Amino acid sequence: MDTEKNINRRSFLGASSTAAIGMMVVPRHVLGGPKYVAPSDKVNIGYIGTGTQGIRVLMEFLRHKEVHIACVCDANRDSQDYPEWHKNELRDKIRHFLDNPTWGTGNKGCRAGREVGKEIVETYYKKIRGLSNYKGCKAYEDYRELLEKEKDLDAVCILTPEHLHATIAIAAMKKGKHVITHKPVSNVLSEVRLAAKTAAETKAATHMFCSAARHTTPLLSEWIWNGAIGQVREVHNWTTRPFWPQGMTEYPKETPPVPDGFNWDLWLGPAEERPFNPAYTHAVFRGWYDFGTGPLGDMGHYSFYQLWRILKLGSPVSVEASRSEYWTIEDGSWHKHINTVSLPRAATVHWEFPQRGDMAPVTLHWYDGGLRPPIPEELEMDNRKMPPEGLLFVGDEGKILAGFAGNSPRIIPEKQMKAFKRPPETLPRPIDEIDQWIRACRGGEPAGACFENVQPINETICLGTVALRADKKLKWDADKMKITNDKDADKLLYRKYRKGWELDV
């Protein structure tokens, strides 16, 4: 086993975005930029995106007494056609949150939209908080109108589909607002880079939700930095997703009418023009390259954030991928359908990372659609099965198996875990993600997953979705933001914008 590494608070928190993930320690109010919220004041938030995930996160925000939800926004007014984890899942959560066992009685399906968000906010502040002077929550259809009219906002929270995240975040930061968004910052690499650049220029307090408060991350860092399994050479990460449709080889041809109360133009945002179809909207947007990043972007940010901290990763130097294919019999012969519009039903992606200081080069392997790596012999020695989702560190002197994002880690086989002398706890354990961002809005340390810190993570994931379409090993120059061996793949780093929605990438 390697000799004990020197571990301290600064080595874990302080790092360059091009070499490792870390938090700056300079209070943000020293840097200037948007107005910072006094510790005695609430962070006044405009909440953009009230679909199912938006409603779930909205209820989390409302529980934080340090914030005030001033207004909500969504392109959909109110409908009962949203997918959910199981029947009445969201309705029951809302009932519990509002202490109202009859909320949603008579709904034909899962209900969400801006009017639902408004109703939840107003009911919570009046009934649960008992605010006698509460003036209500305004609901907007267009985020641009919200940013123009709501002069007293300190920040925005973005829970829209992925293709809108960067567009809204950049507009908000340029208006002097702090920003917190669901992952990813964007489904297009050039927009990830622009959002990080804008955050740095405006000094906005930013955060991307990516499970950035796991206590197992500093724990695993302490293990690996102390040589628990020697130099880590490989990491394997696998998920059972997608749960939504993928593998489509063409865009929908049907042109149903746009539902009443749904602004298709605003939902489409910067993406190329096309007729409305429900195959694009709500949770199923993730399967289309134009709107999402598939299971890699949906789940990968949760695990990759931990890996970047544990292994001090920066940008990869290469990426390659393999994917499931779709064939049909046409006129008595086999016909392969070339897929350029949606992510595959199953895929593997592989990135190569260079040496970082005294840490060896490492290859990161991703599997989705039920694919996973071979079962390690160390797990067979314990007569245990490979979990449906997981994270496996392969070192020169052993292996660590954990849950998908690093939870419940253990050295395998069990006898090696029992013999392992655990190092002392020397690294700080992170606070709640929303609390990290609130602290930054008040002029304190930036959140761990601020845009500058997650830029290389988000870019790595975007490179993975590009590799799925390129079908070859791609060489990546992060400094020049360029794929150096494939001009067509390099074009996929950029979005084809609708007129009037362009960003200066």
Regions found by a protein language model. Name each.
Residues G14-A38, C157, S342, R439-V505:
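C-terminal helix-rich "cap/oligomerization" subdomain common to oxidoreductases
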Residues T50, T255, D260-P446, N458-T465, ...:
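Glycine-rich, aromatic-lined ligand/substrate-binding cores of catalytic
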Residues V57-H68, A75-D78, K87-N88, L98, ...:
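Ligand-binding pockets and gating/stacking loops
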Residues S79, Y140-Y143, L159-H165, V185-N187, ...:
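Short, solvent-exposed turn/loop segments enriched in Gly/Ser/Thr/Pro and often Arg
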Residues H178, V185-G261:
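A contiguous active-site-proximal alpha/beta segment in oxidoreductase catalytic domains
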